[in-house]
């Protein structure tokens, strides 16, 4: 009997919209509404400073887009806001800092108004994400299990997720489907991915249940829970990264995870991008490179805008190895369209394989 064929999923924010979660643009809108409501409270000077900082960051993002010839009215997402805030917070550690004669007076002014304003702003984002990305009831996330229906005889499923939420993990646990995610006894240990036949989950941008502790290192609070989690879980922000440049820092676990993605696509027969908008240049470069290196690799785009996404990316546009399913994730998964397309493409690659 032939070994199961390697099939890779790339999960974007659109995967979880059907479960009731907001995408990154809507999360940015929620952040503004939250800060505006807090700033309207009597004597809440901190909230007013954070709201002004939010407006300053939004203005900077749009100004930069205009300078680059891009549409400054394009929607800003939560990752772009968080990235800007974190870069400003740690601006004095930037290698280019010695060459900057002066930072914007507005940054200095806002920091004078509220000590640690940028740190507090980042903390607010992390705290709100935990609330806004909370896992819905089990019936709303059951459709996510359809991604792993072929795992076993037909395929070996690996899921690379760009999402911070815990919907996928909870869905698999509810369905009693074992998986590995790089943690053993609550501590980061990527060796668990090796030689394991379970479903594999790689969270490229981090996870709401990951933290970094000075004593225990990189730990998980839920899947699976570190035995000492109660000692540090309250005061630790989740271990997340925002934006492409963060992935280029070489920091673990993110270096290991993105390397695993690049390596996986060397041998994968099918890559299914579900709810991914192809807005991450670094991830796109990896996919483009592997489409050149791994000729049997087929790519399936699952999105209501799948055709538009294909046409707007030159390395996808004219490729006969790229197919589109113009559906939301829930319909495409529950109605069997994704499963059928994977099986069709696996059969196609078998017929093309040399004897």
Locate predicted features.
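SIR2/sirtuin-family catalytic core signature
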Residues: 1-19, 24, 28-30, 34, ...
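A general structural signal for short secondary-structure boundary/capping elements
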Residues: 55-63, 201-211, 317-322
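Short flexible/disordered coil segments
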Residues: 67-79, 218-231, 314-317, 326-346
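Intrinsic-disorder/low-complexity, polar/charged segments
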Residues: 73-77, 91, 179-188, 328
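Active-site gating loop/helix substructures
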Residues: 103-138, 170-259
């Amino acid at each position: 009997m032939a070994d199961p064929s390697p099939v890779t999923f790339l999960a974007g924010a659109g995967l979880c919209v059907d479960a009731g979660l907001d995408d990154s643009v809507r999360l940015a809108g929620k952040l503004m509404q939250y800060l505006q409501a807090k700033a309207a409270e009597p004597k809440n000077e901190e909230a007013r400073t954070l709201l002004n900082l939010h407006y300053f960051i939004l203005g900077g993002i749009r100004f930069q887009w205009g300078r680059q010839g891009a549409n400054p009215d394009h929607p800003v997402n939560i990752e772009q806001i968080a990235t800007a805030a974190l870069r400003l917070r740690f601006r004095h550690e930037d290698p280019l800092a010695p060459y900057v004669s002066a930072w914007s007076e507005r940054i200095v002014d806002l920091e004078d108004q509220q000590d640690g304003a940028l740190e507090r702003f980042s903390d607010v984002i992390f705290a709100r994400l935990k609330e806004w990305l909370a896992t819905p009831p089990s019936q709303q996330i059951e459709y996510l299990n359809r991604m792993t229906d072929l795992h076993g005889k037909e395929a070996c499923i690996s899921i690379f997720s760009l999402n911070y939420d815990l919907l996928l993990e909870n869905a698999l646990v509810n369905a009693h489907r074992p998986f590995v995610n790089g943690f053993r006894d609550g501590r980061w240990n990527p060796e668990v991915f090796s030689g394991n036949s379970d479903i594999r989950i790689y969270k490229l941008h981090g996870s709401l249940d990951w933290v970094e502790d000075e004593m225990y290192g990189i730990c998980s609070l839920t899947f699976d829970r570190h035995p000492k989690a109660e000692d540090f879980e309250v005061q630790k922000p989740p271990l997340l990264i925002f934006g492409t440049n963060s992935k280029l820092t070489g920091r673990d676990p993110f270096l290991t995870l993105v390397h695993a993605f690049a390596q996986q696509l060397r041998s994968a027969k099918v890559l299914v991008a579900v709810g991914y908008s192809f807005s991450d240049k670094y991830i796109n470069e990896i996919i483009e490179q592997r489409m050149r290196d791994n000729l049997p690799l087929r790519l399936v785009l699952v999105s209501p805008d799948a055709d538009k996404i294909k046409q707007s990316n030159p390395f996808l546009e004219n490729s006969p190895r790229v197919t589109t399913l113009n559906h939301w994730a829930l319909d495409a998964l529950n109605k069997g369209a994704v499963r059928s397309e994977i099986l069709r493409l696996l059969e196609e690659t078998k017929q093309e394989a040399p004897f």
